[in-house]
Design a protein with these regions (language model features):
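A conserved beta-strand-loop-helix scaffold within acyl/acetyltransferase catalytic domains
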Residues: 4-92, 101-112, 116-117, 121, ...
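Helix N-terminus capping/helix-initiation residues
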Residues: 18-19, 102, 141-143, 161-163
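Alpha-helix termini
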Residues: 92-94, 131
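Flexible loop/N-cap segments at domain edges
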Residues: 97
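Helix-centered, glycine/charged polyanion-binding patches within enzymatic domains
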Residues: 119-120, 124-154, 160-161
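A conserved mid-domain beta-alpha-beta active-site/ligand-binding segment of alpha/beta enzyme cores
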Residues: 146-184
Length: 187
């Protein structure tokens, strides 16, 4: 049984957060994947304390990506996701909002936060690989995009005759695979 104090979304005030450091600190503390880049960050405040954050990244005009949602890990935050999302929908013009759920944590495509917010299942995204380096931080995954051969050659002087995997191994990185994603769309 969860013994953390309850906070209800209906008692929260929603505000746009313009200070990225506040958003990054909150996400690093309360989201399993930590911070990410964003265009708009909305905060849920209860008695002037930040208890929830939802971030959106503008892909192109009218197309958005809901890329992070987190609540204070020391509280049961009920209804805050819905309140933050409704605020975005009411106040920011959009054609489509997409979001991706990690299949390690989201298995039911019909009964989860996305469907409760009005998103519809779009597709499964196949598994892909990431890198991590236990000497740097064993808990942080690095996206494969930063490990392209040309990039590693330019940054570290590694010969282009090596494969990406050989280059990353030489640099102390290990390749790990995820379970894929579930893509949701809100129109």
């Amino acid at each position: 049984m969860n013994r953390n104090p309850k906070i209800f979304g209906r008692k929260c005030e929603i505000r746009e957060i313009t200070n990225k450091d506040i958003v990054y600190e909150f996400l690093d503390k309360n989201h399993i994947q930590g911070r990410t880049g964003f265009t708009i960050a909305l905060g849920a405040y209860c008695q002037n304390n930040l208890v929830g954050v939802m971030t959106f990244k503008k892909e192109k005009e009218g197309y958005w990506d809901l890329n992070r949602f987190a609540t204070d890990i020391n509280h049961q935050c009920i209804g805050i996701g819905g309140k933050l999302f409704k605020h975005f929908v009411r106040n920011y013009p959009f054609i489509e909002i997409k979001s991706f759920a990690d299949r390690r944590w989201t298995t039911d495509t019909d009964n989860n936060l996305y469907t409760k917010l009005g998103f519809e299942f779009d597709s499964y995204v196949p598994p892909t690989y990431w890198y991590y380096n236990p000497k740097i931080n064993p808990y942080i995954r690095f996206h494969k995009f930063g490990f392209r051969k040309q990039h590693l050659h330019k940054q570290y002087g590694l010969p282009l005759t090596m494969t990406e995997r050989e280059m990353t191994t030489a640099l102390g990185y290990t390749r790990i695979w995820d379970c894929g994603l579930i893509k949701y769309v809100y129109k």
